Regions:
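Short, contiguous alpha-helical
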Residues: 7-73, 115-169
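Acidic/histidine-rich alpha-helical segments that form the ligand environment
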Residues: 75-143
């Protein structure tokens, strides 16, 4: 796995997160927390769960397990704006760390502080990305059902927008 490819995949993840939060800005407070039938969580809980997973893996991969243990609570995020602020910090931290990595780092075996499994670092990062894609699809489904679709969130849509210089960063 090349570093530039991994950074691009994380760029896509953060672009989709931004689109989801932008769409969620248009929801009434009761829509943000409305019970879901199409997914296992309401929109707020889905987004908080995704952020929680992203937050927890960075310290795990840096052998700082105790920092990744505290689980975020959905009720601490009353709206998309409060969630966005917390996500911005996570994105900064993750991007700062990703910028320190090389292709060799990505291919090197690491031991997750939580699972104690030894795998190449890139495999753990792909786990973060694929988990995000699942949660993002759930969030997009809920937003669309509420009348505020985030639009196309697939990877090729991101690439087309990026190539056209329209991808938000």
């Amino acid at each position: 796995m090349q570093h530039s490819d991994m950074v691009m995949l994380f760029d896509n993840m953060y672009c989709v997160n931004k689109r989801l939060l932008d769409a969620a800005d248009h929801l009434a407070p009761d829509q943000f927390t409305a019970s879901a039938t199409a997914t296992t969580r309401d929109l707020r809980a889905t987004l908080v769960q995704e952020l929680d997973v992203e937050l927890s893996w960075l310290p795990r991969l840096q052998d700082r397990l105790e920092e990744g243990d505290a689980e975020l609570k959905a009720e601490n995020f009353p709206d998309a704006a409060s969630l966005r602020e917390r996500w911005k910090q996570d994105e900064r931290d993750m991007r700062t760390w990703l910028d320190t990595l090389t292709d060799a780092h990505l291919d090197a075996d690491v031991v997750s502080a939580s699972t104690r499994n030894r795998r190449p670092l890139w495999q753990y990062l792909v786990h973060i990305l694929t988990h995000a894609a699942q949660q993002q699809a759930d969030a997009a489904t809920l937003l669309t059902a509420a009348g505020h679709s985030p639009g196309e969130i697939g990877f090729l849509a991101y690439l087309h927008a990026r190539d056209a210089k329209d991808a938000p960063t």
